């Protein structure tokens, strides 16, 4: 899995490509934590090139969301989530836990 991070004035955008599973999720967690540890809590996660998301990947996103929302500091929003990945999120009842946008521009503009 490849991860790129771009910092904007209002938020940070993380883009991942490939599979997010038990072997690659720690890298995603490290990228998310680096942003939070720098005092930034508004994160856009671009999933347009993510083709698989395991429960470990969802766990990373849920834990990141908890950290971002603590004390109403911010949140993580998702972009371009593939239908099969979105349905797995809905299946476990977490579909409403994240705001989901069609494109990065809309997601960045939401902050």
Regions found by a protein language model. Name each.
Residues 22-97:
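Amphipathic alpha-helical interaction surfaces in cytosolic regulatory modules
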């Amino acid at each position: 899995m490849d991860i790129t991070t771009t910092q904007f004035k209002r938020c940070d955008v993380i883009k991942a490509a490939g599979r997010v599973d038990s072997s690659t999720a720690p890298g995603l967690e490290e990228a998310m934590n680096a942003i939070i540890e720098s005092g930034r809590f508004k994160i856009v996660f671009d999933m347009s090139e993510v083709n698989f998301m395991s429960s470990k990947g969802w766990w990373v996103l849920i834990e990141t969301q908890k950290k971002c929302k603590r004390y109403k500091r911010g949140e993580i929003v998702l972009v371009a989530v593939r239908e099969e990945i979105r349905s797995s999120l809905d299946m476990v009842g977490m579909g409403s836990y994240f705001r989901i946008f069609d494109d990065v521009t809309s997601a960045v503009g939401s902050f």
